[in-house]
UniProtKB/Swiss-Prot annotation:
Gene3D superfamilies in the record: Aldolase class I
Gene Ontology cellular component list: nucleus
Full protein name: Communesin biosynthesis cluster-specific transcription factor cnsN
Extent of Low complexity compositional bias: 374-408
Function (record text): Transcriptional regulator; part of the gene cluster that mediates the biosynthesis of communesins, a prominent class of indole alkaloids with great potential as pharmaceuticals.
Region (Disordered): 371-418
Primary location recorded for the protein, binned into one broad class: nucleus
Keywords recorded for this protein, A-Z: DNA-binding, Nucleus, Transcription, Transcription regulation
Cellular compartment(s): Nucleus
An annotated Gene Ontology molecular function: lyase activity
Record GO biological process: DNA-templated transcription; nitrogen catabolite activation of transcription from RNA polymerase II promoter
Amino acid sequence: MRPLPTGIYTPLPCFFHENEDIDIEALQSHVKFIASAGTIPVVSGSMGEAIHLNREEKKTIIRSARVALDEVNLHDVPIVAGAGGASTRESIELCKDAAEAGADYVMVIPPGYYAGALLADTSSIKKFFVDIAEASPLPVIIYNFPAVSGGIDMDSDLIVQIIQSSANICGVKLTCANVGKLTRIMAQVSRPEFQAAFPRSSATPFRAIDGFIDFLLPSISVGSAGAISGLPNIAPKSCVKLWNLCQDSGSSKQATELQNLIALADGVALKIGIAGMKKLLHRHFGRKVACDMPNGPPCLRCTNKYQECTFEEGPGPRKRARLCEQTETFGTCEQPDGWQDLLTETRPNIGQSEDLEAVSPQGSLLGANQELESTSPRTSHSSLSQDDTASLHSRSSLSSSPGRFPPSQKLVATSDSPSQINSLEFIPDAFSFYIGPTGVTDIHILSHQKYNDQNVSLPKVNGLKYRIMDNPGQKEMATVDFSPPTVFGITDHSLLEKAEPKLDPQLTENGWPRLWAMMDPTAAWHLIKLYSRYIDPYFPILSSHQIPSSSAELNKMPLALLTAICATALPFVMYDDSLYTMLLNPPSSEELYRLCWLCISQELHAPSLATLQACLLLQQRLPTNMYLSDTAFAWTLMATSLAVAQTIGLHRDTGSWTSIPAWEKRLRRRLWWGLYAMEKWVALARGMPSHLGDDDYDVSMLKADDIQDTLSDSPDTQSHIYHLSNLSTILSDIQRSFYSVKAIGKTSNDLQYSLDLARPMRVRLKDWRDNLPSNLRPVSNAVISGEDLDGNGSLYLSYIVTHVALLRALLRPLDRWPAIIKVNKEEPEATYEGAKAVVTGALLCVKEFVEFVERLTGAQWNAFWHSWSRPNFAIAGSFMVHLLQIVTPPNQTDSQSMPELLKYSFEKEHTELQDWIRRWRWATRISANGAAGVKGLTNLGFIKVETLIGNGT
């Protein structure tokens, strides 16, 4: 649970479109603004017009706020949600809704409709709060606000009694402005004996929070934990500054001066009300700062700040004069000293790279007071003028990429997201690409360029900038052992408008309609959940930061990635009751994969992490012909995937990077090792040399800390990919040592050299198996229990086939057995002993493979299998045939010409191998008629082996 911090809390207004639907984009933009300044969001309270919202709208607001916080890496910032209803039952339902939607704490106000009856018997008020707190899945904050609850003003004794009666009461908000009441409450609950007798259910200490910020300074001295006030909506940094000054005894003078100023501002904010606050927010933040273009573009303001100008023309005419221009209104208001300083806070200009827009002093709360003071809260919901309601929407329409935070967005420093750190993945209207050591751009020259405090270069070419990832600063430039930094280019998408080849625009424009024709967003959302449960634990190449909070926001995802996720999850539809109707008329997986490939093709000019993720999931598709090998497309797509990875710099280790969020570092490492594993296994299956050499990357091996922010919290997620990536490095060494063009020439005919070369690899394989956790090991049929699937079978099969790849190389010198004895007559015994050791090891591997297949259950066959599992079954089957050819006794002609050859035969091994093949054929036939056959896992191996050995075994 996220702790309930001390400090400043901002009760968010609720923004509406003209049709009274919630403006989610405006809400999320505002959440990022106030939270990035260091305040805690409070939603669905009095300021949020919760009285006008239904339950679904309240949940939507909470989900949207959580998404906004996560998008700017404020994962540790909690959400407080209003949950006061007209009855105990309704309030409990709202508490449960808030928990489901992602809130961390709820705030409950007494119901005011029957206030007279409640005031006549205050025990009913106590029971109201205690019953709610005991049933709520979230800690409860008591909300004492007499003005909106029928005059119910709970005294300190009643509040303390409620605290004593339920451990789930975590705080109180006092909007009665009674410092004495706060003092009496904290005088009791802060005592050690009280805390020992009445412990809280959460680890966070009890919080008493001011309902106004105008008495913050005096209240802190008696135990106040902060303030929930509407003023931080417009001036959050000033309010946070006041809080910080109040914590420092040496800053009492500055704290008093700022408290006085903020008290005046808070008084005006109370007068203008909710509608006034929302209109003021729009006036200051809802319109871009005017350009300074006396002679046409570019803008002089942007040029002087070494920034790219995104305005192509001067500001258009206003439909209506601003309030600050109505001098008869503004002139009647007096501005206190320092007011201009208070209102010079800035807001992110979403989607733009210019400086944040400064708030004009003429648009102060004082100027808004007289015109707006008579506007009621209900007016702010439904009765604003068209210009006003449109303005609320325009605050968020500045975002060119909803759901993604821009590089100019400033963040609050946390342990997981230091300030000024931004993602390379989410750059509105631009893409990033890795700049290598050769090519037309010289990184040594770039290292001498001027960079701002975000390590972004001052643009010299319109639409192109550079970003240093790991440069510790100019000090390093003077050292002797200076190494060039890792540099990425950032290019506007507009520069790619004429890039060719590209698809017909109509094809891509019809992408979303094609997807929604196959399934609705709700079904797609359920498929994502299935993916999270059944695929992500074994292939965690996605981050939770890439997935929206609800089905309504799926169109913010890259279409290629969304279709790939849905197609990959499609085989698991029957495990979601809500998708049973889809079983009657399921969407075409082929159509989904075609749409995915179409979108990937469009993205190849400017690929991203999502492009690579879609490529890797496209590799996981089920075969179209169960008995034939994949076409060359799989290998071609693998090469494309590696090229995409290198383009986005995935092959470089992020350990020293300081310019991206921690979650993106973790995702990059997981994604790299997912790509690495798939490339090695597809190369093995295709019999091709790997595209990826050990000198071509420096990404460190996965650690437990890297397996975070995944879509699943399964224990398999922590271990499967880690052991898979380690196993894949062993396979890579085997491929390089035995299967490169040059290595084949050295090892094919030299048994002793091959044995020496294989010895350390066999040791590594044994160590890998010995260190495998019990949950990843194959188990007997009797041990399988529960109602879930086990997708670890493909990992252990990969281990067996890695062993097969090594033994297959050792069998090559024995291909002409027993003719090899004729050639090597001088040391036949030594040759035979070496050959027998290889054959014995191969038989043990066959035994392990066959028993593995026999032990597999429906819960394992029906689970997720890596795409290379299908050729792995076939490779293991072909290995048995190869071994059979070697151990088959010599024919009668050879025996008669050289009777001593019988001495060096493998008759016993031949008999044993035949038995294992018989058992394998039976197990494969059975599995091919079940889940394994539906997925084509064993069909290819079965037809290969049957074709090779005929009916003679």
